[in-house]
Amino acid sequence: RRQRQMCIRDSNNIMALKFITAEEAASFVHHDDNVGFSGFTPAGCPKVVPGAIAKKAIAEHEKGNPFQIGMFTGASTGDKLDGELARANAIKFRTPYQSNKDLRALLNSHGAQYFDMHLSELAQSLRYGFLGKIDVAIVEAADVTEDGEIVPTSGVGILPTICRMADRIIIELNCRHPKEIRGMHDIYEPADPPYRREIPIYTPSDRIGSDCVKVDPAKIVGVVKTDEPNEGGKFSPLDDVTMAIGQNVANFLVGEIKAGRLPKEFVPLQSGVGNVANAVLGCMGENKDIPAFNVYTEVIQDA
């Protein structure tokens, strides 16, 4: 296999890494491997290597050879990950959460095993060894340094845990995300019980972790350069019902402020995704009686 030496953009951390194609990356993934993927929802998920793994699975199946992997993700993903691998019948096991119609059809037809565990428990369960070892971690990055510092893109998920546990790490270096995204993340792994302490986050601006994930650079078997946007969520347009819900919530919060039950400077919020959440946040943003406020979020996405 030809090894290409390239410099990452115009970074001051000029480094020589083994840059490979998506197809070459797929050669590091074997039948029965447990593979962990970065990201949380489609944000931060690998975009091109999963498709190459799917093509490899199809080719192996046509030869009469088995090829399926165990899949571990931070949450649901996009069609380029769950969809591609499901349609290729390349999944033997999937956890913790999914929302892809093709994967759902595969699971409901008993084509793969599925563990619908709460996604907040997955990283700890992996560290405990409950779900077996992680053979390969495939992660999307905005930047990576020669000493093994990986800067995630717009989602993290279980990236720190799978990178620490995996034997091999494949990086998709997505040039669509600027390397200046470094500093946006606050990556922190709590100690496992019985040694766990409180997580000392008291305001959205508190920082307790790192702006990158540090790995053993010897485990990075290759870097695949990409220039791919995140897959967007497909929600139907807001209708009268969802807008009415949004207005009701905004009016309720304004009433609580005026009654003194909420402080005038308001309080931090955390929102889910979907039409109702979009309507609520939209109506809050348009309401002049609601001041600017802080928001907790684990991912940035168009949803």
Say what each PLM segment does:
Residues 15-303:
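Conserved alpha/beta enzyme-core scaffold
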Residues 1-8:
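Short, small-residue-biased leader/transition segments that mark boundaries at the very start
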Residues 5, 13-14:
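Residue-level detector of intrinsically disordered terminal segments
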